[in-house]
């Protein structure tokens, strides 16, 4: 996931901790292990046809890329705080029941940041068209338009936040 500038990255506390632990593991365990592999491969002499050296360089690239990615995520992270959320107004962390007025079906979703979204668990990204529409609603009972190629309306039926 590409990050631009200093944009906020909304994360659940669980995901923040997972990324923080991954970062620590990469910096304290993986990076030194890769450096040791490179040193060992260099000691074998001719690097031009050294598969172990090439593999270690590839792994080093992967590790360093992921370290940089995690640094950007953690530096720009904002942990989702549902305790201070405005009740009856949907925001990140809200579980929302709504009616798709085109299909006449009720759906329940939880609005999360992109790193926590999981459609299988009905967790949608705050950047998705449905979440954007829900967050523009003034509250329960409001009807809003979902901005997709074939626009449709939804009605917010309930908004709740985990305690």
UniProtKB/Swiss-Prot annotation:
Going by the UniProt record, its keywords in alphabetical order are: Coiled coil, DNA-binding, Transcription, Transcription regulation
SUPFAM superfamilies, A to Z: FKBP-like (SSF54534), GreA transcript cleavage protein, N-terminal domain (SSF46557)
Residue stretches in coiled coil: 49-80
Q: Does the keyword Phosphoprotein apply?
A: no
Against Pfam families, the record matches this protein to: GreA_GreB, GreA_GreB_N
Does the UniProt entry include the keyword S-adenosyl-L-methionine?
Answer: no
Role noted for this protein: Necessary for efficient RNA polymerase transcription elongation past template-encoded arresting sites. The arresting sites in DNA have the property of trapping a certain fraction of elongating RNA polymerases that pass through, resulting in locked ternary complexes. Cleavage of the nascent transcript by cleavage factors such as GreA or GreB allows the resumption of elongation from the new 3'terminus. GreA releases sequences of 2 to 3 nucleotides.
Would you identify the family this protein belongs to, as annotated? Belongs to the GreA/GreB family.
> What's this protein's name?
Transcription elongation factor GreA
Organism ancestry: Bacteria, Bacillati, Mycoplasmatota, Mycoplasmoidales, Metamycoplasmataceae
